Amino acid sequence: MSGNFKKKICLITGARKGIGLSIGQTLAQNGYRVIFSGRKLNDCKDTVNQLVTDGFQAVESPINLSNLSSLKEQTEMALSIWGTVDILINNGAVIEPITSLEKIELQDFEKAVRVNYLAPSLLISYCWNNLLKNRGKVINVLSGASI
């Protein structure tokens, strides 16, 4: 890619495995700068190292969606890597325990609400100014099991 093309920057949560990992790899291999985010440092280390070795731009920055009190700071750290974000992909979620509604425990329900609803909403708000300035996009990925 040449000229004045500005490589788009994508922050993706839940990028350790599955859909998030595949999306992140595909974006990096297609010229995006990708911030892979898992719950803790080194969750995405192997993927990022392989992409960088192959000549793509990828970094890791942990964002623990279940810890709302540190979410803003973790998001700011991720954004500081390349200074902004163009695409936010909210992919991280919890789906356990998978049980009938009458058997679910309060702490499990609270965690699901915190990780699957509150954290993605807060991430959008923390990235909003950058997304607005860059005419960015938000993609929310949900499974029926996380609802």
Predicted segments with their positions:
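The beta1-alpha1 cofactor-binding region of Rossmann-like NAD(H)/NADP(H)-dependent oxidoreductases
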Residues: 62-74, 106
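Conserved NAD(P)H cofactor-binding loop of Rossmann-fold oxidoreductase domains
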Residues: 91-97
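Substrate-binding pocket helix/loop in short-chain dehydrogenase/reductase
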Residues: 99-101, 105-110
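Catalytic loop of short-chain dehydrogenase/reductase
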Residues: 137-147
